[in-house]
Amino acid sequence: MIPPPNVTGSLHMGHGFQNTLMDIMTRLKRMQQYDVLWQVGTDHAGIATQLVVERKLEGEGKTRESLGRSKFEKEIWKWKKYSGNTITKQLRRLGSSVDWSSEKFTMDADFSDAVSEVFCKLYDEGLIYKGYRLVNWDPSLQTALSDLEVSNEEESSFIWNIKYEHDSGHLTVATTRPETLLGDMAVAVNPNDKRYKKLIGKTVKLPLTDREIPVIADDYVDMSFGTGCLKVTPAHDFNDFEIGKRHKLEFLNILNKDGTLNENAPKKYQNLKMLEARKIIIEDLDQANLLAGSEKHKLAIPRGERTGEILEPYLTEQWYLKTKNLAQEASKLVRNGKVQFVPKNWEKTFFNWMKDIEDWCISRQLWWGHRIPAWYDENKKVYVGKSEAEVRKRNKVSGTLTRDEEYWIPGFLRNCGLLRP
């Protein structure tokens, strides 16, 4: 099967090289009297396609919101019909000996039915669930992204040292993101750090707010980094999220979906973008004599691969695929030799991935793609099924049902062998 290229563009040299190798193998096996199907198709490319069409509409003075979901989908189908043929024409010009009679598009009706069936199967087996967790959030697209869709780029920035005052003085906390202090719920120190033992269990004043937050002890804190004091923002940092769960802290979300500060921030900072808020917060800290200095620092900035936008850790309810058991099964196949890596040294990378794997966020807040086959009753109870009729029949539901608005990314199904054209 040709890994389906996106309908958003045209083939590049990599595609040409890949398809030439596959064509050679296909023709060779046919000459050896094998029955060969070389499957061809294109990918609907949810995020990329939606972005292209939104930019086209922007030039016409329209937005997807102004059109509504149904009309926006029609615009995408029109664009797909116009652009999608570019790739297939290129493949034909290459002379690729694919079976054109079986050409597929990942939004074809039979493919969508298969995707829904697999979602239901995984849900029934307890492998798909819905839960609140931190995600990589793109404020431009206003959707969650998986780690694979994140580009971590090293950029020059600063570390700011901020004073958190208490009854007998202050703690100095080092941070690369002073704007997130508005969502701080604690200052953490290492339980073995003698400098701060007497302060554990007491409170400090959160700068620029009227809140006080506790000083807690956690082994995660590195005594040798900075001052050994760590600001804990459970709703806006992946490591802090885990600390927050351990200490039962409140998860205070200070962001709107568009990346501006919300009503949980002091009024002065509300509706500001994060970098705008950073500038003002640093000025305010300095004026209040709460800024203890800064120093240049290089750090990895997570950006969305498609938009280049700085991503925010964002607490939201999403659909997830449990990966631990799948990772264990995949690792067994490599260890017993049923799956082999060439060259063999890639096994080490593979096992590292499998060991540190997290549950995969598969839902996206998009208007193009495979819609999640889930419905909700008036009490927000969720029902999963291939259709509303099936949900009603299986669960004996007679009241109003509302379809889940979100879409999901089933690309991993092909890689796992769960879905074939």
Where are these regions (language model features)?
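Short, conserved helix/loop micro-motifs enriched in His/Cys and acidic residues
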Residues: 1-11, 96, 101, 221, ...
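N-terminal cofactor/phosphate-binding cores enriched in small/glycine residues
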Residues: 1-51, 55, 59
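Secondary-structure capping and boundary motifs in well-ordered enzyme cores
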Residues: 2, 14-17, 21, 41, ...
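Conserved phosphate/anionic-ligand binding catalytic regions in large, soluble enzymes, centered on
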Residues: 7, 14-16, 41, 118, ...
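Catalytic alpha/large subunits of respiratory electron-transfer oxidoreductases
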Residues: 34-35, 115, 149, 178
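Catalytic alpha/beta core of large soluble enzyme barrels
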Residues: 35, 178-258, 286
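Residue patterns forming the tRNA-binding/recognition surfaces of aminoacyl-tRNA synthetases
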Residues: 54-171, 225-383, 388-398, 404-407
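Short acidic, glycine-rich loop/turn motifs
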Residues: 164-168, 191, 205-210, 377-379, ...
